[in-house]
C-alpha cells in the first residue's frame, strides 16, 4: 500500500460538510454511514449486497473478533478483508465500549482492562497496545484508539477521571500504532455532556495528533436534546481538515441533525437490527411490517424506493414471511433499511454540495410528519 490516507472537503453548507476520504482500498464519500459487521458480517446480508446499497465502508468489532475467531486466526487466513470477502475500507472499533457493556468481571487499571468473555467466561486483557496489535492483525484501514467508556449515569468527577484515562490511553495508542502508511488512527473525544471536559479532551487529542477524530460517549441514553447540545459545539473543537466521526448514531433524524452540525461519519446497528425484527425505516418514518394492517396490502413498502424489497415484493408478502419466520424476511428488510440509510446519505451529500441543505432537511421532516400511507 503506497497511497496514504487523506481527507478532502469539497463543499460546505453552514456547518455541514461533504468530502472524500481516500484510502488504498477506495474512497469514502462523506457524510458517510457505516453498516456494522460486528463479527465479520452484516447480519442477513452478503457483502456484495451491502455494497449494492451504496455503502463505501463497513465497521468491524475488535472485542467480538478477538474472542471469536481471534485476530491471530484471521491474519493466518489473509486478513479481515479477505476473510469476510469485503474489498472496500473497514473501520474497527477499539473494543473498549464492548468490554464495558458486555464482558463480565471487569477489572480496570491504568494498564488496561482485564475481563471475562461473555461467550465462555475465558479471561482476557485489553490495553491500548493490545488493541492496536489486534487491529493491525485484522488489517483494518481505520483504527480506533483504545478508550474507556464509563457506565451511565455517572458523576461529573467520574466522567472526568474516565476522560483523562482515555486521553492517556490515546497517547499510548498513538505510540503503539506507529507509522503505517495507508492506514489511519482516530482519536476519540470523551467528556460526557460537560463542555469543559469536552474541550479538555479535544485539546489533548489535537496535541497528540490523529488522522481523524471521533466523538464518543454519546447515544448512550442521554437523549437527542442533550446529544445535539454537545454536537452544537463539539465538532468545532476538532481540526477542520480531518474527518469527524460520531460513534453509535443512529436514527435517521439523529443522523440528519448530526450532519447539520458538522459530523462526517456515523455507524449504528439500528438499520440491520430493526430489519431483523420487522421494523422498516422509510422516508415517512418507521413501519412495523408485522402489524395486521399489512396482511392484504399489495402495495410496496415505499413506492419511491428501488431496493429489492420494495421493487419486487408487497407489504402483504413481507408481512407473511415475518409471521412465518422465514429467513428471507430478515434479508429483505435489512436490505431495505440499509438502502434507505444510504439514500439518505446521498441526499445529504447532494444537498450540501448544492447549498440546499435547509430545503432537504425541511422536506425530510415534512415527509416524516405525514406518517405512513393509510391502510387499504
From Swiss-Prot:
Pathway: tRNA modification; tRNA-queuosine biosynthesis. Substrate binds at residues 93-97, 147, 190, 217. Keywords: Glycosyltransferase, Metal-binding, Queuosine biosynthesis, Transferase, tRNA processing, Zinc. Transmembrane segments: none annotated. The active site is at 93 (proton acceptor), 267 (nucleophile). Residues 248-254 are annotated as: RNA binding. It is an enzyme of class 2 (transferase). It comes from the Bacteria. One of its GO terms (biological process) is tRNA wobble guanine modification. One of its GO terms (cellular component) is cytosol. Its EC number is 2.4.2.29. Zn(2+) binds at residues 305, 307, 310, 336. Catalyzes the base-exchange of a guanine (G) residue with the queuine precursor 7-aminomethyl-7-deazaguanine (PreQ1) at position 34 (anticodon wobble position) in tRNAs with GU(N) anticodons (tRNA-Asp, -Asn, -His and -Tyr). Catalysis occurs through a double-displacement mechanism. The nucleophile active site attacks the C1' of nucleotide 34 to detach the guanine base from the RNA, forming a covalent enzyme-RNA intermediate. The proton acceptor active site deprotonates the incoming PreQ1, allowing a nucleophilic attack on the C1' of the ribose to form the product. Homodimer. Within each dimer, one monomer is responsible for RNA recognition and catalysis, while the other monomer binds to the replacement base PreQ1. This is Queuine tRNA-ribosyltransferase. It comes from Cereibacter sphaeroides (strain ATCC 17023 / DSM 158 / JCM 6121 / CCUG 31486 / LMG 2827 / NBRC 12203 / NCIMB 8253 / ATH 2.4.1.). The lineage of its organism: Bacteria, Pseudomonadati, Pseudomonadota, Alphaproteobacteria, Rhodobacterales. The gene is tgt.
Amino acid at each position: 500500500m503506497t497511497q496514504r490516507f487523506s481527507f478532502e472537503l469539497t463543499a460546505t453548507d453552514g456547518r455541514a460538510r461533504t468530502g472524500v476520504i481516500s484510502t488504498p482500498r477506495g474512497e469514502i464519500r462523506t457524510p458517510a454511514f457505516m453498516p456494522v459487521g460486528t463479527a465479520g458480517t452484516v447480519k442477513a446480508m452478503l457483502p456484495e449486497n451491502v455494497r449494492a446499497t451504496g455503502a463505501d465502508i463497513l465497521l468491524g468489532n475488535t472485542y467480538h473478533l478477538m474472542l471469536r475467531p481471534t485476530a491471530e486466526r484471521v491474519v493466518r487466513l489473509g486478513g479481515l478483508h479477505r476473510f469476510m470477502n469485503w474489498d472496500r475500507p473497514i473501520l474497527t472499533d477499539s473494543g473498549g465500549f464492548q468490554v464495558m457493556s458486555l464482558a463480565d468481571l471487569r477489572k480496570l487499571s491504568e494498564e488496561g482492562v482485564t475481563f471475562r468473555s461473555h461467550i465462555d467466561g475465558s479471561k482476557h486483557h485489553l490495553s491500548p497496545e493490545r488493541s492496536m496489535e489486534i487491529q493491525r492483525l485484522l488489517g483494518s484501514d481505520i483504527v480506533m484508539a483504545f478508550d474507556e467508556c464509563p457506565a451511565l449515569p455517572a458523576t461529573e468527577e467520574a466522567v472526568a477521571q474516565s476522560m483523562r484515562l482515555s486521553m492517556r490511553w490515546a497517547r499510548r495508542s498513538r505510540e503503539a500504532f506507529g507509522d503505517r502508511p495507508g492506514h489511519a488512527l482516530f482519536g476519540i473525544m470523551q467528556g460526557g455532556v460537560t463542555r469543559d471536559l469536552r474541550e479538555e479532551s479535544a485539546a489533548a487529542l489535537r496535541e497528540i495528533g490523529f488522522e481523524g477524530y471521533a466523538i464518543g460517549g454519546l447515544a448512550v441514553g442521554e437523549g437527542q436534546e442533550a446529544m445535539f447540545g454537545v454536537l452544537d459545539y463539539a465538532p468545532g473543537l476538532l481540526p477542520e481538515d480531518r474527518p469527524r466521526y460520531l460513534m453509535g448514531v443512529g436514527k435517521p433524524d439523529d443522523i440528519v441533525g448530526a450532519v447539520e452540525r458538522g459530523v462526517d461519519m456515523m455507524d449504528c446497528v439500528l438499520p440491520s437490527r430493526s430489519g431483523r425484527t420487522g421494523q422498516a425505516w422509510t422516508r415517512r418514518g418507521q413501519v412495523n411490517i408485522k402489524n395486521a394492517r399489512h396482511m392484504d396490502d399489495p402495495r410496496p413498502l415505499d413506492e419511491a424506493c428501488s431496493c429489492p424489497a420494495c421493487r419486487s415484493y408487497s407489504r402483504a408478502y413481507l408481512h407473511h414471511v415475518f409471521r412465518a419466520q422465514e429467513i428471507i424476511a430478515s434479508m429483505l428488510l435489512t436490505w431495505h433499511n440499509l438502502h434507505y440509510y444510504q439514500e439518505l446519505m446521498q441526499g445529504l451529500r447532494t444537498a450540501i454540495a448544492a447549498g440546499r441543505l435547509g430545503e432537504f432537511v425541511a422536506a425530510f421532516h415534512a415527509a416524516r410528519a405525514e406518517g405512513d400511507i393509510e391502510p387499504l
